[in-house]
């Protein structure tokens, strides 16, 4: 591989002085609202992406103006947990320093801001720092935000699992001082020539992004098998004893390039809790050393495992960890949805899960969601938990405070909306107008599309059946569409590829059923299939399993062979 020309990003990382590049100079330049091409890649490691308003792109071009550049900043919030005080700080930033005046909950249990002018970036990062929050490694070729099941019902087990997720996040952070120097005005420390700046990552970091999740069965809201590295909690007598480790998942692919494909992770075996960091570091360093640095489209861990083989990869991980995998423990992976409304935990505290459509927290007529969460944060004594379904849990509410919290939620439209099973299980990415990769709408169109799905389910008498529906504007897969029972992936404006056949639990991928079709064709196809499902389904059979059983699509068993075949 050393004889081949590496991907451009590899040279950028090598020459960046551990992610410094010329970001500081670009930040100080008032000539343009953008960064240089090279720095646009490096700023991802600091937690943000350069974007522009694509709705205005042509108009500004005609006016001989540069695109209306802005930035999307994503925070690092392991397990999605923050305090009410932190949330008030997060809210203030959205209201005063972004043009979108909104907060977007993501599919990886964190939040992001859209519409940040370059001049406000440093202020936002410093304001986040004052709330003990940051955006380090929220993007880039590093370990991203670590997900953890936010289940507040089994409070002790969740606490133990969350502690592991937090430790993973902290342990695998980049060590470079670039973030502190550029954004927090800390002094650059003198270093010796032989000093190891990045003991885990090295000078070129990872070949591509790396995603981790901790699942607490029976819930699989974190979609553990879609991650590069997953830890499925194993408990005995309510105590965490270890994890089943999974590796090699990932959603991204490229339209028309069959050498790229989504993939679910493989099961590797059971590991004890005390060995988690050894195995996490082992898997990451194997990917660091074996991953493809020539073709970024083939550089995720899933391709490393496919190319080198399961057994060879497993043996190398065991060698580096210094521990052997034990046989996988039996656990049951179930629902990927959230528990909406009030649920009582084993500790007697109450938890209120609020549905946030597409994760967008913004004040709208009749639904002042942002104000509502702000008012709750002012009086709440527990914590806020963001879910991977883009929702919010007001966790740890004392019984005597329930009425007050619920009253505020209802007053501001956070509670009381009619929520079907399918809408509650469905998510979409941001897409247009800010995402530069989007080929079609997602977030802006998705609520209307789900209205159509709800109507079709009602028509056929199957409204009680939750169906996992996901939509993305491109095949990078941020909303994990290839693990949805109905997946819609943007191909062109108003056109989508329709995927069917994933399992409800997230243990089998879907497969393309129709390519490049418009809304009318999508709905006609689903109308027919829902009609068949209503009369032909077996007892308890989910929609995804039905479409495979009756031959609408073939089951994807081995993604490298089956997804496109």
From Swiss-Prot:
It is an enzyme of class 1 (oxidoreductase). [4Fe-4S] cluster binds at residues 429, 435, 474, 478. Pfam families: NIR_SIR, NIR_SIR_ferr. One of its GO terms (molecular function) is heme binding. SUPFAM superfamilies: Nitrite and sulphite reductase 4Fe-4S domain-like, Nitrite/Sulfite reductase N-terminal domain-like. One of its GO terms (cellular component) is sulfite reductase complex (NADPH). Pathway: Sulfur metabolism; hydrogen sulfide biosynthesis; hydrogen sulfide from sulfite (NADPH route): step 1/1. InterPro entries: CysI, NiRdtase/SiRdtase_haem-b_fer, Nit/Sulf_reduc_fer-like_dom_sf, NO2/SO3_Rdtase_4Fe4S_dom, NO2/SO3_Rdtase_4Fe4S_prot, NO2/SO3_Rdtase_4Fe4S_sf, NO2/SO3_Rdtase_FeS/sirohaem_BS. Keywords: 4Fe-4S, Amino-acid biosynthesis, Cysteine biosynthesis, Heme, Iron, Iron-sulfur, Metal-binding, NADP, Oxidoreductase. Siroheme binds at residue 478. Its EC number is 1.8.1.2. One of its GO terms (biological process) is hydrogen sulfide biosynthetic process. Component of the sulfite reductase complex that catalyzes the 6-electron reduction of sulfite to sulfide. This is one of several activities required for the biosynthesis of L-cysteine from sulfate. This is Sulfite reductase [NADPH] hemoprotein beta-component. The lineage of its organism: Bacteria, Pseudomonadati, Pseudomonadota, Gammaproteobacteria, Alteromonadales. The gene is cysI.
């Amino acid at each position: 591989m050393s004889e081949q020309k590496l991907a451009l990003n590899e040279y950028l990382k090598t020459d960046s002085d551990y992610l410094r590049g010329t970001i500081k100079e670009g930040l100080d330049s008032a000539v343009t609202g953008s960064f240089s091409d090279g720095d646009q890649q490096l700023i991802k490691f600091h937690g943000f992406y350069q974007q522009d308003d694509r709705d205005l792109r042509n108009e500004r071009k005609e006016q001989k103006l540069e695109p209306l550049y802005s930035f999307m900043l994503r925070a690092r919030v392991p397990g999605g947990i923050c305090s009410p005080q932190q949330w008030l700080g997060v809210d203030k930033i959205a209201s005063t320093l972004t043009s979108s005046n909104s907060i977007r909950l993501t599919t990886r249990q964190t939040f992001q801001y859209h519409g940040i002018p370059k001049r406000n970036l440093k202020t936002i990062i410093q304001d986040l720092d004052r709330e003990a929050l940051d955006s380090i490694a929220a993007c880039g070729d590093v370990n991203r935000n670590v997900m953890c099941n936010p289940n507040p019902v089994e409070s002790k087990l969740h606490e133990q699992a969350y502690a592991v997720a937090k430790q993973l996040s902290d342990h695998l952070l980049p060590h470079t001082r670039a973030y502190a120097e550029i954004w927090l005005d800390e002094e650059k420390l003198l270093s010796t020539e032989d000093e190891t700046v990045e003991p885990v990552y090295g000078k070129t970091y990872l070949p591509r992004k790396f995603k981790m999740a901790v699942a607490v069965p029976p819930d699989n809201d974190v979609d553990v098998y879609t991650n590069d590295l997953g830890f499925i909690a194993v408990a005995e007598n309510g105590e965490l004893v270890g994890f089943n480790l999974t590796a090699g998942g990932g959603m991204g692919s490229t339209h028309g390039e069959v050498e790229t494909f989504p993939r679910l992770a493989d099961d590797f075996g059971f590991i004890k809790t005390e060995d988690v960091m050894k195995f996490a570091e082992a898997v990451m360093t194997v990917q660091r050393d074996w991953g493809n640095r020539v073709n970024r489209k083939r550089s995720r861990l899933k391709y490393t495992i496919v190319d080198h083989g399961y057994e060879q990869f497993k043996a190398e991980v065991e060698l580096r960890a210094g521990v052997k995998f034990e046989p996988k423990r039996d656990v049951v992976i179930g629902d990927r949805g959230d528990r909406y409304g009030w649920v009582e935990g084993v500790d007697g505290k109450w938890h209120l899960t609020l549905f946030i459509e597409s994760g967008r927290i913004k004040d709208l007529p009749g639904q002042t969601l942002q104000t509502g969460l702000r008012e709750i944060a002012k009086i709440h004594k527990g914590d806020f938990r963001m879910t991977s379904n883009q929702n919010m849990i007001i966790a740890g509410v004392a019984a005597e405070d329930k009425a007050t919290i619920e009253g505020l939620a209802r007053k501001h439209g956070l509670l009381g909306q009619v929520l079907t099973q399918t809408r509650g299980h469905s998510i979409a990415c941001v897409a247009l107008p800010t995402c530069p990769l989007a080929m079609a709408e997602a977030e802006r169109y998705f609520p209307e599309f789900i209205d159509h799905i709800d109507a079709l389910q009602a028509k056929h008498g199957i409204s009680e059946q939750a169906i996992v529906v996901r939509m993305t504007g491109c095949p990078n897969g941020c909303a994990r569409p290839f693990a949805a029972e109905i997946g819609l992936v943007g191909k062109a404006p108003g056109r989508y590829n329709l995927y069917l056949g994933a399992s409800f639990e997230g243990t089998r991928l879907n497969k393309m059923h129709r390519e490049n079709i418009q809304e009318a064709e999508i709905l006609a196809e689903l109308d027919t299939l829902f009609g068949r499902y209503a009369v032909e389904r077996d007892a308890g059979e989910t929609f995804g399993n039905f479409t495979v059983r009756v031959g609408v699509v073939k089951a994807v068993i081995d993604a490298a062979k089956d997804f496109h075949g």
